[in-house]
């Protein structure tokens, strides 16, 4: 990869402070998001995907969470809450859309009023130019009649339409990086596909980077250039989407791929047995060892370190250590 990373995360750890104890819910994550490319972070529910994304946006309350490591974006550390310059990046150079679009909107204000709130916070535009900008981004996201749309309240729109509006709102400031936290999970299957295609089209048009949070390997196959497999808040595997699908190295990655429905297997899918560990009761060795069909004795005793299989493929597994 010749280009410099737009976002460079180094040894990110997130600790939940509870009952006078500190639990590492995310530990020592390192990954890059490159200009114009999509990095997908995939894992089961409870793997730490959303915690990772929210920590980058400073959305986790300091009274309950503490952080270590760096997340460098335009030479600013996104984890530094005392830096005014860093805070100014959120909503302008970095935007985020969420799993449930309804929670992104205030029910007592029209869509237009909420667009103007974003503009007043981040852009210096006259009311006329702001209005034109709102209509333009709504047209870009597929609205045929944006004038009518902006007069409506959130409850008057479907989930798919609200997610399109959330994307349009994120695009108002022409961000360099869009973080999409499970953006299609709460939507119907046909609408999911439309939203994914919209994101791909907008990315190609604007050149923005995408950090996609998902539990769905189908979304990864459709959207990602690079893939970061996360389990129990720890990196399992990190590589290009081609290597993840064609040469998966970690048993968890293999099991995720096997758990997808397929018309080419006699058994349409193979579920992963057991449940991910709770952050308060993590296994002594590899966090995946209790569920792993290839576990070695050492897997239950010592956590593996990251091993490079090549320049762009890393795995944490004793099978490759």
Predicted regions and their residues:
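Short catalytic/signature loops enriched in Gly
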Residues: 5, 147-148, 238-321
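A short, proline-enriched helix->beta-strand linker immediately N-terminal to the Walker B motif
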Residues: 172-176
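Hydrophobic anchor residue at the start of the ABC signature
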Residues: 115, 167, 191, 195
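Conserved ABC ATPase "signature" region
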Residues: 128-148, 257
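Conserved ABC transporter NBD signature motif
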Residues: 65-77
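P-loop NTP-binding/switch modules centered on Walker-like glycine-rich loops
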Residues: 179, 183, 187-268
């Amino acid at each position: 990869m010749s280009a410099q990373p737009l976002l460079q995360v180094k040894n990110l750890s997130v600790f939940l402070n509870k009952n006078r104890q500190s639990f590492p819910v995310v530990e020592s994550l390192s990954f890059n998001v490159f200009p114009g490319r999509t990095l997908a972070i995939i894992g089961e529910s409870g793997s730490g995907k959303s915690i990772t994304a929210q920590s980058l946006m400073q959305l986790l309350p300091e009274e309950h969470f503490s952080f270590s490591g760096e997340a460098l974006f335009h030479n600013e550390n996104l984890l530094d809450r005392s830096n005014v310059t860093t805070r100014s990046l959120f909503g302008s150079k970095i935007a985020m859309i969420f799993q449930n679009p309804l929670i992104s909107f205030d029910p007592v204000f029209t869509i237009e009023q909420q667009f103007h709130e974003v503009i007043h916070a981040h852009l210096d535009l006259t009311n006329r130019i702001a209005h034109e900008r709102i209509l333009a981004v709504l047209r870009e996201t597929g609205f045929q009649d944006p004038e009518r749309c902006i007069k409506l309240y959130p409850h008057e729109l479907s989930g798919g339409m609200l997610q399109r509006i959330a994307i349009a709102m994120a695009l108002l400031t022409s961000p360099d990086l869009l973080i999409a936290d499970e953006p299609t999970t709460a939507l119907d299957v046909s609408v999911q596909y439309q939203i994914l295609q919209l994101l791909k089209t907008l990315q190609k048009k604007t050149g923005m980077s995408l950090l996609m949070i998902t539990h769905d390997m189908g979304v990864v196959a459709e959207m990602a250039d690079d893939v970061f497999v996360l389990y129990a808040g720890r990196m399992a595997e990190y590589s290009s989407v081609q290597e993840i699908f064609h040469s998966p190295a970690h048993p968890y990655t293999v099991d995720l791929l096997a758990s997808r429905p397929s018309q080419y297997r006699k058994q349409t899918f193979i579920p992963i047995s057991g449940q991910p560990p709770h952050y308060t009761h993590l296994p002594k060795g590899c966090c995946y060892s209790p569920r792993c069909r290839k576990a070695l004795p050492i897997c239950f005793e010592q956590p593996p370190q990251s091993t490079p299989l090549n320049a762009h493929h890393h795995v944490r597994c004793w099978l490759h250590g």
